[in-house]
């Protein structure tokens, strides 16, 4: 997988990695390599982040969980290039080969959340929105949300509008 693609995948899923040590397997991201490509999944009990990308070369179907701290380091090492990252798995370790750098991390063992069941397959509802406006609205409403409290952002989708609200100990936000 290209370095910039892996970097983007990590950046778009790492926020949902749990910091709760009572479920150690969720303190990392699940990597799934199958006929669809590479899928990364992270969960923390409140959020689920998923990113899927096609991959050129794959040697079978397999999955493993990489600790969030290791992925943070991989993200820092990856550059904005199309050079390919080699990902190799062993019985207890994962090896990332990024250019001339090799990072070896232990695998997290345990039963990862059944994430496929958490996402509806045939949802008839489709939403089309202006990405810039949507992200700006999320940024405004999220100003009072702290990473520590992880207050949910509630979206109510109506005809021609999306109503976003959140309630935290600091106050309420609505847009």
Where do the protein language model's features map onto the residues?
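DNA polymerase processivity clamps
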Residues: 1-52, 56-108, 122-175
């Amino acid at each position: 997988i290209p370095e910039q693609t892996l970097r983007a995948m990590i950046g778009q899923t790492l926020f949902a990695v749990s910091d709760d040590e009572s479920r150690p397997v969720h303190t990392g991201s699940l990597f799934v390599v199958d006929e669809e490509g590479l899928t990364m999944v992270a969960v923390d009990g409140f959020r689920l982040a998923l990113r899927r990308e096609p991959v050129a070369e794959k040697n079978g179907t397999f999955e493993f969980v990489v600790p969030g701290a290791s992925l943070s380091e991989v993200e820092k090492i990856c550059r904005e290039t199309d050079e390919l990252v080699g990902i190799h798995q062993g019985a207890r370790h994962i090896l990332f080969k990024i250019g001339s750098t090799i990072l070896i991390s232990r695998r997290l063992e345990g039963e990862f959340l059944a994430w496929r069941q958490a996402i509806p397959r045939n949802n008839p509802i489709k939403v089309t929105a202006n990405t810039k406006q949507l992200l700006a609205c999320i940024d405004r409403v999220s100003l009072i949300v702290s990473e520590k409290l992880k207050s949910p952002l509630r979206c109510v989708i109506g005809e021609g509008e999306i109503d976003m609200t959140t309630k935290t100990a600091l106050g309420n936000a609505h847009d």
